Each structure stands twice: as C-alpha cells, then as structure tokens.
Amino acid sequence: MGELGHRRTQTGVVVSDKMEKTVVVRVDRLVKHPLYNKYIKRSVKYKVHDEKNSCKAGDKVQIVECRPLSKDKRWALRQILESAA
C-alpha cells in the first residue's frame, strides 16, 4: 500500500504521562472574539498513543491523527520536539 493520504498534525504539551502507553497532550490555539476583536486562548486535551512510553510531563510533542485505538484515543505520537528536562 502507498501513502495513506494527508493526516492532521498538531503540536502540544504533555500534561500527564501516568497511563501505560498513553499521554495526555494539551493543544492551545488563539480564537478572535467576534465582538471585542480580542484574541482568547482556547485549549483542548487529547489522549495520545505513546508506544515506547518515551514522553514525560512538560515535553513539547507533535501528534498525528490515526485510526481509533480505544474509546478516547485517536491520536498517536509522531515526535518529541522539546524535552522538559
């Protein structure tokens, strides 16, 4: 099989690494308020598959969309961009 097509990627910070092969990643984005034209920080947390348990809390990571791995996991770890330590 060839390339699976374009998959969405996100960049975020690991906030929890207490599960086996799973980390929680917070992805922040800026949204402009329609009336006041002020930018507001919004964030969403994703459960991300980490096969090697290599992430620690505070790491900056890149994640990629994948097939559903469990009830909540639809993202996988692509790479660690910055280590917290």
From Swiss-Prot:
Disulphides: none
A Pfam family recorded for this sequence: Ribosomal_S17
GO biological process, one term: translation
InterPro entries in the record: NA-bd_OB-fold, Ribosomal_uS17, Ribosomal_uS17_bact/chlr, Ribosomal_uS17_CS
GO cellular component: cytosolic small ribosomal subunit
Keyword line: Ribonucleoprotein, Ribosomal protein, RNA-binding, rRNA-binding
GO molecular function, one term: rRNA binding
Keyword Repeat: no
The protein's role, per its UniProt record: One of the primary rRNA binding proteins, it binds specifically to the 5'-end of 16S ribosomal RNA.
Assembly description: Part of the 30S ribosomal subunit.
Family listed: Belongs to the universal ribosomal protein uS17 family.
Protein name in the entry: Small ribosomal subunit protein uS17
Organism: Trichlorobacter lovleyi (strain ATCC BAA-1151 / DSM 17278 / SZ) (Geobacter lovleyi)
